[in-house]
Regions:
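Surface-exposed amphipathic alpha-helical segments
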Residues: 159-179
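Short, solvent-exposed recognition patches
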Residues: 34-153
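Terminal, regulation- and interaction-focused segments at domain boundaries
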Residues: 16, 24-27, 64-71
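Hydrophobic membrane-insertion alpha-helices, especially the h-region
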Residues: 2-20
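Alpha-helical transmembrane signal-anchor/signal-peptide segments
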Residues: 21-41
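A residue-level signal for conserved active-site and pocket-lining positions in enzyme catalytic cores
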Residues: 11, 43, 163
């Protein structure tokens, strides 16, 4: 019976260790928000005011959240100062809102960045959703879970930029695909 007790103790311990609140690495600049101009998004986007519900969510988020548009796309930009479960894939929210979500292959942009991509639909509305997380050193994640465990285990120190783009399935005629 003792080996079983020891095994369970080690399992509980293994789960608890990565969930401790302080990551191994710490970046002292993590609390200094650099402003939206530093975000890895195109310049000249128009800010969109958050809804009341979005503002309530942002109040408990460990960082800053901004929403912007270029007229054809919506950019949800999150500056994240610490690992958190409050950063989750767009598909989680979209599924909760009744959208169907179909994962697509990783999108490689002309600038060399990589994006997790999905096709989503709700009734007749269809969108392509792209998302990525990038740290100040240029390391990127296309999967929120991979980012979380990397951050929670202290493999990198924040802050990070998380960018989600909601766009038509095909860019409108005459509109260049961003990033």
């Amino acid at each position: 019976m003792k080996p079983v007790v020891c095994f369970y103790f080690l399992c509980v311990r293994a789960v608890w260790i990565p969930l401790r609140s302080t990551p191994t690495l710490r970046n002292d600049s993590a609390d200094a928000f650099p402003g939206w101009a530093a975000a890895p998004i195109p310049t000249g986007l128009a800010p969109i005011a958050p809804s009341e519900r979005e503002a309530r969510f942002a109040a408990g988020f460990p960082g800053k959240i901004g929403v912007f548009s270029d007229g054809a796309r919506i950019y949800v930009v999150r500056w994240v100062r610490t690992s958190t479960r409050k950063l989750h894939p767009a598909s989680d929210c979209l599924l909760a809102l009744g959208y169907s979500v179909k994962p697509l292959p990783i999108f490689a942009s002309t600038d060399g960045s990589h994006w997790g991509t999905s096709s989503v639909q709700h009734g007749t509305e269809r969108l392509r959703v792209r998302e990525r997380i990038v740290d100040l050193g240029g390391r990127e994640w296309t999967d929120v879970s991979a980012w979380f465990w990397s951050a929670a285990l202290g493999h990198n120190a924040g802050p990070w930029w998380a960018v989600t783009i909601f766009e038509p399935p095909e860019p409108p005629a005459g509109v260049k695909a961003p990033l």
